[in-house]
């Protein structure tokens, strides 16, 4: 997939064909533009996340799981959107076998300033 276009369609099936990666990766970056980074992720188990420098959005394509963040456990499912601010510890747990999500990092280091 070319990452140089100013507009494009990113197809789930094409992105999914790149997983697992050569070293067994369960995610593939499909688009980069400035501070924007989009990847398809097909994790196979609980993912302990490290806090990220940028704000992060997850678009849940299929499946279900639980987002552990700020001491809370929030269940989610296909069609949901998750937001995690920069620097927040979080973990994706109890994912179903068919789980897939688009992961989007964006904005400046430290995250956007709330309105």
Tell where the protein language model's regions lie, with residue ranges:
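A short, N-terminal "cap"/entry segment at the start of jelly-roll beta-barrel domains
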Residues: 1-40, 45-49
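Short secondary-structure boundary/capping segments
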Residues: 28-30, 49-50, 57, 73-74, ...
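Short strand-coil-strand connectors
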Residues: 32-34, 68-72, 95
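Short, conserved beta-strand element in jelly-roll/cupin
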Residues: 52-67
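Short acidic-glycine-tyrosine-enriched beta hairpin
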Residues: 71-86
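Ligand-binding loop in jelly-roll beta-barrel domains
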Residues: 86-112
């Amino acid at each position: 997939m070319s990452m140089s276009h100013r507009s494009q369609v990113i197809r789930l099936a094409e992105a999914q064909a790149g997983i697992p990666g050569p070293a067994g990766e369960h995610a593939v970056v499909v688009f980069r533009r400035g501070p924007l980074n989009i990847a398809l992720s097909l994790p196979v188990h609980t993912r302990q996340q490290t806090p990220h420098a940028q704000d992060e959005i997850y678009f849940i394509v299929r499946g279900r799981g639980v987002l552990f963040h700020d001491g809370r456990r929030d269940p989610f499912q296909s069609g949901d959107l998750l937001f995690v601010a920069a620097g927040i510890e979080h973990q994706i747990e109890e994912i179903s076998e068919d789980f897939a999500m688009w992961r989007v990092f964006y904005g400046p280091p430290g995250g956007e300033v709330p309105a």
